[in-house]
Amino acid sequence: MNNPFKFGTIVGNEYFTDRTVELEEIRRTMLGPNHLVLISPRRFGKSSLVKKAVNGLDRPAVFINLQQITGIEELASMLLKGVFKLFPIERLKHWMTHFRFIPTISTNPLTDAVDLSFPIATDETAVLEDVMELINKLGAEKGRIIIVLDEFQEILEIDKGIDKKLRAMMQVQENVNYIFLGSQESMMTDIFERKKSPFYHFGKLIYLKKIPHEDFFEYVRDRLTPVMDDNATKAAETILSFTLCHPYYTQQLASQVWEIAAYESVNQDIVEKAIERIVTTHDYDY
């Protein structure tokens, strides 16, 4: 029997919790020509939610985390690598003959991972423009592409004025849907709601909230029942009263409760014991 609770990584399938309303809202938006802005605190499950929604659309999609990006050329490279995962490289090489700066492309024979580099002293803005134009052309030919940009508030740290440049490139793309994810509410709101911002009202805005108590309660109780029987109801309530329905911490605590109930001879105060173990474990980090 496997632990039915998962935390700390992107989850899907049986590990995914509710969010049916948000899933449908994302899907409906992506079926049209508009873009989406999704804001919530960290560890609320934004990435898992969007990945599940996008996977259900059967559309080509590229996922980029802007925390990993340090410059404009690197952003262009990451977007291009994402496209390489979707389409045959030889076909893309033909399209790239029209690039102003053609990258050197290599493939790892063991992992099939693609690496690329642009010539030294390249005009970074021109590189990004060419990549964005390629993505739009592919969307016209293969079906509208979805680009997911996680931790989008980091765009302001990549390069001064990149928000204006990126907005200018995106606004002419008719065959791309963008999903912007962000965990810094004030920064994301400033980017998409401030009138003087280049991205003002660029997409439909959704603030992701906690999972409703009743939905989360059923999810936790049903997965604890095989190892706790009638005690699962009380345990689920105790867990949620402690975590206040925070997605990450609920999954983490429920996972620890399940481990104790499944493998140890403990019948009372299981939730309290689980909390104590988690706290003790994190104490070692300091």
Residue ranges and their predicted role:
Residues 32-44, 48-145:
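P-loop NTPase nucleotide-binding core
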Residues 19, 47, 246:
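Short, conserved phosphate/pyrophosphate- and ester-handling motifs at nucleotide-, phospho-/glycolipid
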Residues 222-285:
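Amphipathic alpha-helical "lid/sensor" segments that cap RecA-like P-loop NTPase cores
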Residues 117-185, 193:
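Conserved Walker B catalytic segment
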Residues 190-241, 263-265:
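Helix-loop-helix "sensor" segment of P-loop NTPases
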Residues 1-36, 41, 89:
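A short, basic N-terminal segment
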Residues 33, 67-71, 154, 183-187, ...:
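Conserved nucleotide-binding/hydrolysis micro-motifs of P-loop NTPases
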Residues 58-61, 174-176, 201-204:
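Short glycine-/polar-rich loops that comprise or flank the Walker A/P-loop
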